[in-house]
């Protein structure tokens, strides 16, 4: 896939083989700890500290580790944040940066998570910078910076979709109303619906139809969707590359792949 950095969102990979391969192929690893903006309370702080110490000691000799990060889109509680910062400086020989938060403190926020036309990415940083404290003061045409999370809805190929969507549900696709409100349809269970509303599935469906024409069945829609996937991803990368070292520093696509068959946030499917 030509990635040169992989972010382990909330510390989601522990397998030695992953780190061995990253070492071998020169892929940098942004390594989160296990805290998330909506789930930041730690029931047993001492157990958390012991686990964090074990993690750093076990992985610190992997040259692929580039950054340790305390939490996703928030900061750890002060007690844990201070512990992580001091422990990493001590145990990892102060060789690597520790960031409290994945999208603040000099980073450029998060998002968007739905498909946007290429022009959008060239003309505005496209981020909800409200997360940044202090906020980026540069208006909409600056603030690209280092974006650690940006993505889009992404339909897999028909060959994949037919493996997890029952044939009786292939066509027609859910209506806009169903995408917005339905809980129980099979599409929503695979994150094409309200479960992933910030991927804007209605806009994704309408963009495929508007830009590449109405389809007569699922296979045709999936084929056209690949063109939209390419256009949106290409726009993100090219916009950041166009401004590289002139406001932009890099971006990490949310995300590489899903843990479950899905219609959102992937560069290759389950």
Residue ranges and their predicted role:
Residues 1-67, 186-231:
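Active-site-adjacent substrate/metal-binding segments within catalytic domains
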Residues 6-8, 29-32, 98-100, 146-151, ...:
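Hydrophobic faces of well-ordered beta-strands that scaffold small-molecule active sites
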Residues 10-13, 72, 102, 255:
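Residues that line or immediately flank small-molecule/substrate-binding pockets and catalytic motifs
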Residues 13-16, 37-39, 74-78, 106-108, ...:
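Flexible loop/turn segments at secondary-structure boundaries
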Residues 17, 21-25, 58, 83-91, ...:
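Alpha-helical structural signal in soluble globular domains
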Residues 21-23, 44-45, 82-84, 160-162, ...:
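Short, glycine/charged-enriched secondary-structure capping and boundary segments
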Residues 56-179:
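Active-site region of glycoside hydrolase catalytic domains
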Residues 68, 132-270:
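Substrate-binding clefts and catalytic carboxylate motifs of secreted carbohydrate-active enzymes
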């Amino acid at each position: 896939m030509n990635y040169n950095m992989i972010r382990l969102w909330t510390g989601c990979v522990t397998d030695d083989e992953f780190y061995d391969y990253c070492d071998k192929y020169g892929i940098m690893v942004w390594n989160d700890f296990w805290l998330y903006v909506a789930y930041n309370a730690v029931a047993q702080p001492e157990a958390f500290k012991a686990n964090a110490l074990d993690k750093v000691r076990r992985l610190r000799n992997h040259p692929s580790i580039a950054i340790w990060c305390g939490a996703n889109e928030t900061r750890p509680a002060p007690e844990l944040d201070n512990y992580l910062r001091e422990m990493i400086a001590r145990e990892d020989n102060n060789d690597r940066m520790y960031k409290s938060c994945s999208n603040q403190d000099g980073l450029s926020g998060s998002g968007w998570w739905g498909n946007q036309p290429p022009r959008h990415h060239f003309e505005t940083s496209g981020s909800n910078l409200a997360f940044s404290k202090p906020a980026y003061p540069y208006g909409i045409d600056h603030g690209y910076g280092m974006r650690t999370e940006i993505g889009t809805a992404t339909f897999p190929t028909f060959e994949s979709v037919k493996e997890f969507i029952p044939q009786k549900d292939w066509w027609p696709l859910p209506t806009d109303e169903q995408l917005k409100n339905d809980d129980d349809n099979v599409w929503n269970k695979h994150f094409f619906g309200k479960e992933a509303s910030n991927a804007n599935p209605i806009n994704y469906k309408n963009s495929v139809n508007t830009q590449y024409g109405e389809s007569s069945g699922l296979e045709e829609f999936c084929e056209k969707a690949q063109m939209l996937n390419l256009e949106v991803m290409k726009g993100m990368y090219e916009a950041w590359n166009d401004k590289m070292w002139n406001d932009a520093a890099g971006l990490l696509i949310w995300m590489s792949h899903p843990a479950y068959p899905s219609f959102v946030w992937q560069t290759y499917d389950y």
